[in-house]
Amino acid sequence: MMERKPLPIGIEDFKEVIDSGYYFVDKTLMIKDLIVNKVKVGLFTRPRRFGKTLNMSMIQRFFEKTDESNAYLFDGLKISEYPECMQYQGQYPVISISLKSMKQATFEEAFAVFKDLIRAEILRHKSVLFQNDAIEKTDLDRDRKSVV
C-alpha cells in the first residue's frame, strides 16, 4: 500500500511543501500561462482557503533570482516539461505582496501595514536596486519617500 503524503494545511511556502514531501496538486502550468500571456502584473482573487498564497509562493520561487537555485523544486512537475518556460526560472527579482494580513480596523492602520509590506519588499531587493546603474540613488530616495 502506498504511503499517504500529509496535507499541507496552513503551509504557505512552496519550498516547504516540496522539501517536506507534502501532498501537492501541480498547478505549475499557471506559470506557463503567465509566460505565454506576457503578464507583467498579476492580481489573484479567489475565496479564502483556495491556495492563493501558496500559488504566489510557487510563482515567486520559480521566477526569483536567489543565491541558491530553486530549480530542483520544479523537477517532475508539469512546468519542467516546457524548456521554453524553464529558461525563465531564477532570472528575476520578484515583488510579492499578500494582503491576507490586512485586517485592520481603520484605513490609517491598514495603510501603515501596507507601507510596511512595501518597505519589506524594498529592503529584500535592496542589493538589486542599488547595483543597477540605470536606477539613480536619488530616484530611489524620492520613490522611497513617497511610499514609506
Where are these regions (language model features)?
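Walker A/P-loop-proximal flanking segment of P-loop NTPase domains
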Residues: 1-81
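P-loop NTPase motor core
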Residues: 10, 15, 64-129
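Short, glycine/acidic-rich hinge or "gate" loops at secondary-structure transitions
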Residues: 127-139
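Conserved small/polar residues in nucleotide/adenosyl-binding loops
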Residues: 147-148
